Amino acid sequence: MRLVYNTTFHVDDEIAAGLIKSIKEFYIPYIKAKGLCCDILFTRVIVHEEEGRSFSLQLVFPSEEDYVIFIDIYKDKLLGVLIELFGQNLLHFSTTLEEIE
């Protein structure tokens, strides 16, 4: 059973490039170095919003154990870095999904 931890981010147009850079150059390499995820997917959310841009970051965990390690040790630390960089300009919510086999 694989678990997917999906975080959706919404930012103003002016800082979208900064968020993309931070996710690609810091967040994803940091997670990959920990060896917990079997796949990572970073995408633009296709919606017609009047303001801002939305992105989805999906971390796929091969086991519940790896997922729990991420949640307990790394989740708040990584999100904290993004909040420190973008402050109240960063809206986010997360959902945990279970793959149906």
Indicate residue ranges for each PLM-predicted region:
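Short, well-ordered beta-strand segments in beta-rich or mixed alpha/beta enzyme
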Residues: 2-9, 42-73
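Short amphipathic alpha-helical segments
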Residues: 15-42, 77-81
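Surface-exposed beta-strand edges and their flanking turn/coil or helix-capping segments
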Residues: 18-22, 34, 54-57, 70-72, ...
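Glycine-rich beta-strand-turn "strand-cap" elements at beta-sheet edges
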Residues: 38-52, 80-101
